[in-house]
A protein has these predicted regions:
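Central antiparallel beta-sheet cores of small beta-barrel/beta-sandwich binding domains
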Residues: 1-118
């Protein structure tokens, strides 16, 4: 798998960085490449935008992200995805000011995929 294979739009579902493992949000993740062939990520979750940049190696995608909270502060974190196929990403994430005892989780499925889920 190459970094170019990951470019596209994904439907996401995830859980927040707390003790609950239940799906707490859904949204869309769009991955593109910049002029240096690095990943640019744009999330839309519950009408909120998040952005990030990242890199890819050995089927692992790492994205440093940030967003403005409702309190107008900028929050930052890192997301790590295992690229199961070019259409399925399974990941976890952590924010700087999140609960350090837990990780958030995120599952991504390419929106135009023909792959079936189990």
């Amino acid at each position: 798998m190459t970094i170019q294979d990951l470019v596209g739009t994904y439907s996401i579902s995830g859980s927040n960085q707390d003790e609950s493992n239940e799906i707490t949000y859904k949204g869309v993740l769009t991955l593109t490449l910049d002029q240096n062939n690095r990943i640019k990520a744009d999330w839309i979750i519950n009408s909120h935008k998040q952005k990030g940049t990242g890199f890819f190696k050995d089927n692992i995608l790492v994205i440093n992200f940030s967003y403005k909270g409702d309190d107008h502060k900028t929050y930052k974190g890192v997301a790590v995805y295992r690229c199961i196929t070019k259409d399925v990403l399974d990941g976890f994430w952590s924010e700087k000011h999140g609960d350090p005892l837990y990780l958030g989780s995120e599952y991504c499925l390419r929106m135009e995929t023909t792959e079936r889920l189990n």
